[in-house]
From Swiss-Prot:
NADP(+) binds at residues 48, 54. It comes from Aeromonas salmonicida (strain A449). Belongs to the chorismate synthase family. Its cofactor is FMNH2. This is Chorismate synthase.
Amino acid sequence: MAGNSFGQLFRVTTFGESHGLALGAVVDGCPPGLEISEADLQIDLDRRKPGTSRYTTPRREPDEVKILSGVFEGRTTGTSIGLLIENTDQRSKDYSDIKDVFRPGHADYTYHQKYGQRDYRGGGRSSARETAMRVAAGAIAKKYLKQMHGIEITGFLSQLGPIKAEGFDAAQIEQNPFFFPDAGKLEELDQYMRDLKKEGNSVGAKVQVIATKVPVGLGEPVFDRLDADIAHAMMGINAVKGVEIGDGFAVVEQKGSEHRDEMTPAGFASNHAGGILGGISSGQDIVVSMALKPTSSITVPGKTINTEGEAIEMITKGRHDPCVGIRAVPIAEAMLALVLMDHLLRHRAQNQGVMTQTPQLR
């Protein structure tokens, strides 16, 4: 399996499985001198961890991160940062009956065909449990971005099933278990999720993440455009089936006179492009949305096959999220932070001394 690392100068490598002893990550390229502690990383890990509300999986993992290396006397040393989270609430017996069965809609079949074997306990390496380490690594990037450049990254659930956020109150996002910015829809969300759990079903969601105060100039055309790397990062998150930058697929119905973000001496008149032009950050807010599919781990009977190719009907057991989009919010924030961190270091390496007479717009 060769796809366990992400980034070039700020590079993150993760390891571990859903029901293994532990999850881990190695973070390379972090500049020295950044104040960082396990408590800093724990903030975002607590936002992502399972068992925090009745709307997510009942699996209870404390997700307590340990910094093994790369930090001395509270500051990064510039060497590899080793991170570890122990798994403590595995129930592998929940999966013994699917050892020879492919769960429809999961990675079971493709992992089996590619590698000739698979860890059937909670999906093994294909489980979203792995994303805990992305969140831990992303927390390092988020702190650097904010402390050194003033960059803030905020994610939220913009749609759950048919329920869309119509109002936006940033203060509400961390005040409810949905990361939802529209307080007027919380009761509707609660009832919808209750009904969904009674059905034994699941539903998809849309997550939006916004980065503010991003400097102009990040992105490496032509193959490492900033939007291309962001899309790559978001599509690497479990269950993500689509990514939009700015207005995304809505541009299909727009005319050029509407979509172009006109410029004045006072700044940009709009931000349909989502803060990226020609693969390079424009200095405006970077706006990213992603669509997540409904999890296939449901108690509604479904058709599948076993390893012998025989047709069977199955009901998925175990502990699962009825909507994976809820806990995807801090994951999306982390992945955007990793991309921006990597591109800041790459930009600094080649273009640090570049100056123009043109004022920077917002």
